[in-house]
Amino acid sequence: METFLYTSESVNEGHPDKLCDQISDAVLDACLEQDPDSKVACETCTKTNMVMVFGEITTKANVDYEKIVRNTCRNIGFVSDDVGLDADNCKVLVNIEQQSPDIAQGVHGHLTKRPEEIGAGDQGHMFGYATDETPELMPLSHVLATKLGARLTEVRKNGTCPWLRPDGKTQVTVEYYNDKGAMVPIRVHTVLISTQHDETVTNDEIAADLKEHVIKPVIPEKYLDEKTIFHLNPSGRFVIGGPHGDAGLTGRKIIIDTYGGWGAHGGGAFSGKDPTKVDRSGAYIVRQAAKSIVANGLARRCLVQVSYAIGVPEPLSVFVDSYGTGKIPDKEILKIVKENFDFRPGMISIHLDLKRGGNGRFLKTAAYGHFGREDPDFTWETVKPLKWEKPQA
């Protein structure tokens, strides 16, 4: 049996780039909560003792940007300079303007267009992916890397591992078998965790705690064997972290946000963008399409691409690839996709209820992945029933 190795990585909520994603989405939530028609393009950057939010926002909402920044940093655990940032004493810079009137008239006609007439907020192409290798219909390498990161945060916040600090990264290598185009995971080959820690803990304690409290609860036993390799804080020291260790920027973790390197990516980031931005809404609807294809048994693995032109509602192209796992030809799957999914941005917004902010809805997406999550707010994870005829044997 010929196998291959494939690797996906993830980062924690305290990673500087992810901190920026979460601040940008917390701003989006606050705008949409008061004004569902808010137009938001919010970027964040951070470095030692400083956070800056900048971009274009047109909204009727009354938003205290500085308060949102400080609350988001505090909730993650950035409460003193030792851990990488002090939420209550860092500098917060705000440089936000209105959306360009040129873009506004072309996309939503200054809010006069009907939903089906709303044009794409920009050009671009987005991909959705699904695979039957996990219950979430997501790649196992990505699922495990993501869950290890989420578990690190959990044991830090619940006090199980009090030596943990907010920043950290995970990476998982899985050995796979290619079953006629479908991916079958056989075992976990390598687990890598690099986590920020305090001054007091030894490397041996770090390794023991990570194995017992992070790896064991997350990675199913059937995937681990005596040959599995563990790299636990391989650099030997990671006390300085967060924005003190590295600068951070919104939109720098787009593969972690999606499929861990599987499928494909059009390059557009998600966080801080309202649903007229097809980078986000387009990627969400094609995930729903790909997931529905696999869940309905049309294929074991599937990639869907959609593309747009600024100001034009209808997509320029839709593409489906079942990697040879389709029960019917890809062109027939494509026909089913076009009949069941409306790719116009205004209609995506309605069908996936994307104008609803508040309740940390988009903030939740900004750490530990936008896809494969069981949460009613992740409306794009709902499987649509698709009618199709099984070919006669």
From Swiss-Prot:
- Anything known on activity regulation? Increased activity in the presence of 25 percent acetonitrile, methanol or dimethylformamide.
Name the positions where K(+) binds: 43
Q: Name one GO biological process term.
A: S-adenosylmethionine biosynthetic process
Q: Reaction(s) catalyzed by this protein?
A: L-methionine + ATP + H2O = S-adenosyl-L-methionine + phosphate + diphosphate
Which pathway does UniProt place it in?
A: Amino-acid biosynthesis; S-adenosyl-L-methionine biosynthesis; S-adenosyl-L-methionine from L-methionine: step 1/1
Cofactors, names only:
Mn(2+); Mg(2+); Co(2+); K(+)
The residue range of the signal peptide is none
pH-dependence annotation = Optimum pH is 8.5-10.5. Thermoalkaliphic enzyme which tolerates conditions from 6 up to pH 10.5.
- Where does this chain mainly localize? cytoplasm
> Which of the seven top EC classes does this enzyme belong to?
transferase
Q: Where does L-methionine bind?
A: 56, 99, 246, 277
Gene3D superfamilies on file: 3.30.300.10
SUPFAM superfamilies named among the record's database cross-references? S-adenosylmethionine synthetase
Which key words tag this protein in UniProt?
ATP-binding, Cobalt, Cytoplasm, Magnesium, Metal-binding, Nucleotide-binding, One-carbon metabolism, Potassium, Transferase
Any one GO cellular component localisation term in the record: cytoplasm
Characterize activity with respect to temperature. Answer: Optimum temperature is 50 degrees Celsius. Thermoalkaliphic enzyme which tolerates conditions from 40 up to 55 degrees Celsius.
- Protein's cellular compartments: Cytoplasm
Among the GO molecular function terms of this UniProt record, one is: metal ion binding
Note how many cofactor molecules are bound and how: Binds 2 divalent ions per subunit. The metal ions interact primarily with the substrate. Can utilize magnesium, manganese or cobalt (in vitro). Binds 1 potassium ion per subunit. The potassium ion interacts primarily with the substrate.
Q: How does it assemble?
A: Homotetramer; dimer of dimers.
Please give the family membership noted in the entry: Belongs to the AdoMet synthase family.
Q: What does this protein do?
A: Catalyzes the formation of S-adenosylmethionine from methionine and ATP.
- This protein is called S-adenosylmethionine synthase
- Native organism is Acacia koa
Q: Which gene encodes it?
A: KSAMS
